[in-house]
Amino acid sequence: MVSRLSSRLQALASAPCRSLSCAQDVLHRTPLYDFHLAHGGKMVAFAGWSLPVQYRDSHVNSHLHTRQHCSLFDVSHMLQTKIFGCDRVKLMESLVVGDIAELKPNQGTLSLFTNEAGGILDDLIVTSASEGHLYVVSNAGCREKDLTLMQDKVRELQNKGSDVALEVMDNALLALQGPTAAQVLQAGVADDLRKLPFMTSAVMEVFGVSGCRVTRCGYTGEDGVEISVPAAEAVHLAAALLKNPEVKLAGLAARDSLRLEAGLCLYGNDIDEHTTPVEGSLSWTLGKRRRAAMDFPGASVIVPQLKSKAQRRRVGLMCDGAPVRAQSPILSPEGTVIGAVTSGCPSPCLKKNVAMGYVPYEYSRPGTPLLVEVRRKQQPAVVSKMPFVSTNYYILK
């Protein structure tokens, strides 16, 4: 399975918005690069960065450890930006589908950059920081595209007299994910993490490092946090977290299978510029006020799809036989090609093959029997609800 996952990560690296140079010496390095090597990290090229695909543990053991305890991921390759000024919400709402104005202080939301054709340019998390700015985290592979999009809008508003401004952060970003993540982190912070629910954040001192923004979110389906930490303190913080026996380092392979079990999209594979939020089963990201106003890019395409139903839909698949990979054809029970897989892997938790892909709307109901083609052989699949594995986000009741 490890070799199969390594092959899969190489495929992900060549996906749209994830182009890489072939020369290892031109790859970006996170502040934890030497730390990874010292801890046995197997480094690979991903989205223009040198990142660990796994450590000494097998991919499966790392995956299961995250589900049962907690793991530390280096996600410093992600683009972190701050947007300042009285028009910061106006700027962001001119680019995304979400209702940013309704966010409470230190509340965040997953949103989507869209184009005028309704296609998804990237997915991102926007937090309304109580310090008076928006904190934005978006994909490394779309860094230049996202920066151009935001910087062009900044200049447009500034030319009209706005005080809006954008700052690119050089912080590292560490993700501590798993059911014991909060317990581990609580030992190093004074703030009561029981008061920090899913998709909220706070600036706090973490294991002696001041100025860290801790956000209760992640890409695994488990409870956990992402910690934006000054780059010079990243190694100190990672080492402090690893002193707890609950914590192990994890890499890209585990992160990919964890997010797939959780039914989460990978930009460039499962969603892209040719996919609308409705087609991608992401209609929930569309703010109610924004739908009514139809004032976001691509609204004239996206909003009508909410009523008329998009012609195709992203679905989950449970598959028999050999593991299913991206671009594997999806067929009707009669053997007609009707779509394609966008992500797939053996699920370490379910011990079954899981995948997601696009099929015509009439084939999207859970329980619908289909076929997938792997190495020119057809094998059974069934449309399944996502997430495949129940999520465990920390939500206050």
Swiss-Prot record:
It catalyses: N(6)-[(R)-S(8)-aminomethyldihydrolipoyl]-L-lysyl-[protein] + (6S)-5,6,7,8-tetrahydrofolate = N(6)-[(R)-dihydrolipoyl]-L-lysyl-[protein] + (6R)-5,10-methylene-5,6,7,8-tetrahydrofolate + NH4(+). PANTHER family: AMINOMETHYLTRANSFERASE, AMINOMETHYLTRANSFERASE, MITOCHONDRIAL. It is found in: Mitochondrion. NCBIfam families: gcvT (TIGR00528), PRK00389.1 (NF001567). Substrate binds at E226, R255, Y393. GO terms for molecular function: aminomethyltransferase activity; lipoic acid binding; transaminase activity. Its main location: mitochondrion. Keywords: Aminotransferase, Mitochondrion, Transferase, Transit peptide. It comes from the Eukaryota. Its EC number is 2.1.2.10. Residues 1-22 form a transit peptide. This is Aminomethyltransferase, mitochondrial.
